[in-house]
Amino acid sequence: MKDTIKTFSTPHGELSIDTVADAKMAKVFERGEYHQQDTVELLSAFVNNESVFVDGGAHIGTITIPLARKAGHTIAYEADAATCDILRQNIERNAVSVDVRQKGIGERSGRGEIASVREGNAGAHTLLVGEGAVDIVTLDEELERFDVMKLDVEGMELSVMRGTERIMKEARPTVLFEVNLSQLRAHEAPLHALDAFFRGRGYSLYLPFRSSGQLVLGAASSLSLVALCMYPGAYFLNRTSSVFDIIAVPEGKAVPLPVVPVWRTMQYVLARNLQEKIGRVRKYLI
């Protein structure tokens, strides 16, 4: 094992991580916190022992492993070879059953290569389609169906969904995806196109957040409006943006968490933007 790999005891098991390649997440573990705990709670509400869960961009398994304990069948995609090795070790260490596939996922089958987006954050690697050592597949080719998917593929979300047309039509899965304005631009995938993809197939979009300590789903009438109000600098000036998650739920499907209206969602978004600005000013003054 590399000297830079360290194992942490977490609420969801023993997890190893490369403390150099994944310095950002390692610091979260060092503080005794769990990376994406809210995401685990959110997805767990949609999964049961009959569900097929897909983790697209599984990284070291922070979502894969706790969800595998609840889902009937779990499939994890991780394109980066070194990260996938750690993922497999973490799965074995925690004695959960996961079908691990060292492949990239996209709109069509082919080849590609891994490119680093941010140093010290291996989870932020992206996939460049073309020539390379990475096998790229579509989910329609790979799978018969799935019920719930988490998608964190650094700007390739729209491409992956276009390769999932049949499953979207036949199985009507719930999809949690990350919105990263910077990476969407890098992959020439407009946010409004991602929004239209889901709404055009009969999906409602929600922004997950905490209200009075409770996890809720905020109705999102427009992803562009949410992004504009949350990160105006990234939206208008192409600055590097932070990310936020959106969950797409088929219309008519029961939602297992409280839903709040659009005005409450926007109230939260504007307050979050203001809090981040105040935080930056305080950091500068101190």
Where are these predicted regions, by residue range?
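Short internal loop-to-helix segment that lines adenine-nucleotide cofactor pockets
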Residues: 28-52, 100, 109-113, 120-171, ...
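Short beta-strand-to-loop element that shapes/binds the nucleotide-sugar donor at the catalytic cleft/hinge
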Residues: 105, 109, 179
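Conserved Rossmann-like nucleotide-cofactor binding loop
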Residues: 82, 106, 156
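Short loop/edge segments at beta-strand edges and connector loops
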Residues: 100-103, 177
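S-adenosyl-L-methionine
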Residues: 1-90, 96-99, 125, 129, ...
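The conserved acidic donor/metal-binding loop of glycosyltransferases
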Residues: 57, 104, 152
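A generic beta-sheet turn/junction motif
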Residues: 10-12, 107, 118
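Conserved acidic-Pro-Pro-aromatic motif
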Residues: 4-5, 70-71, 141-255
